[in-house]
Amino acid sequence: MANKTVLFNKHLESDAKMVDFHGWDMPLNYGSQIEEHHAVRQDAGMFDVSHMTVVDVNGTDACAFLRKLLANDVAKLKVPGKALYGGMLDHNAGVIDDLITYYLNDTHYRIVVNSATREKDLAWIAQEVKGFDVVITERPELAMIAVQGPNAKAKAASVFNTAQNAAVEGMKPFFGVQADSLFIATTGYTGETGYEIIVPDSEAEALWLALLEAGVKPCGLGARDTLRLEAGMNLYGLDMDESVNPLAANMGWTIAWEPADRNFNGREALAAIKAAGTEKMVGLIMEAKGVIRPGMSVFFSDSDGVEQQGTITSGTFSPTLGYSIAMARVPRSIADTAEVEMRKKRVPVKVIAPSFVRNGKQAF
């Protein structure tokens, strides 16, 4: 039996096409993936992300534990509610998961991890926490709704109560605040402004219906994927996993090398990889007809004229740009043009930084 989120019946009421997503019955779309994509880029859309795993980390050693567990450094978080994105690495510097950490106070942090990696993540955390004065608490009674788009905050404001609107007023990106029963964060997975709202299961249906009434369009996994790829955001399992180090997954900016004495998991292995050199992640755009798909090969000649090869990790048709975009892991010697092999033919592509659309506009 697949898991169902607390909003399952609401999806059916909106005529969602349901699919299995890592053991969860989730909406793929509600009729038109393209319309849902454009709603988020131009207005406001919402996603049921209750399959994500919310974990609270409490105790006097919470900070010390997370400084060992994560490659980014939670000691940088000084203001309550501030959030941090980063990787949880194994001892070989492979990416176990990518996640967001919220600093609530010195003895309380909240992490949100991917659903597909839940059991693996919790087992790793349980193993690594030994010896620390920390209590790990999964919060399965909490649902999560992401409201994203240029009008998302205004439409959410019409649903929030006075205290909640006061709590989020002027809140910068990558913050979270507990406001009555809602934990409201200025985070997202679309490249647009908006909120990710953690809500008790018992209140999730009412919040979903209120947002629907406020004109927020329900959006499924299909639009979520095209939006995150346009924004150049990684999808765990496609763009990285334990076989990939963060430097080869456009996550170098999330590695806190300083202070030098912070011995985070995988540090030694990652330092050796960095010194030896590793592949990198690039963005590709293809204005010719066709769609670049994961697993396709990328070819280019390096400065010595030697042919090099890389692999597409994520690829799709970009509804915003009107042509195909992709992310690829390639040797570092790549320049600004390459070719992708499609149906035994090589098609030219442009090579850019892996970010295509932000806040509704072309980002390159």
Swiss-Prot record:
Q: Does the keyword Transmembrane apply?
A: no
Q: What's the short name of a Pfam family annotated to this entry?
A: GCV_T
- Swiss-Prot/TrEMBL catalytic activity: N(6)-[(R)-S(8)-aminomethyldihydrolipoyl]-L-lysyl-[protein] + (6S)-5,6,7,8-tetrahydrofolate = N(6)-[(R)-dihydrolipoyl]-L-lysyl-[protein] + (6R)-5,10-methylene-5,6,7,8-tetrahydrofolate + NH4(+)
The record's annotation in InterPro entries points to: GCS_T, GCS_T_bac, GCST_C, GCV_T_N, GcvT/YgfZ/DmdA, GcvT/YgfZ_C, TrmE/GcvT_dom1
User: Which keywords, in A-to-Z order, does the entry hold?
Assistant: Aminotransferase, Transferase
Which GO MF terms are attached to this record?
Answer: aminomethyltransferase activity; transaminase activity
Q: What class of enzyme is it?
A: transferase
EC number(s) given by UniProt: 2.1.2.10
Q: Name one GO biological process term.
A: glycine decarboxylation via glycine cleavage system
Its GO CC terms are:
cytosol; glycine cleavage complex
The family line of this record is: Belongs to the GcvT family.
State how it assembles. The glycine cleavage system is composed of four proteins: P, T, L and H.
What does this gene product do? The glycine cleavage system catalyzes the degradation of glycine.
- What is the name attached to this protein's record? Aminomethyltransferase
Please name the source species. Answer: Shewanella woodyi (strain ATCC 51908 / MS32)
Lineage from the top down?
Answer: Bacteria, Pseudomonadati, Pseudomonadota, Gammaproteobacteria, Alteromonadales
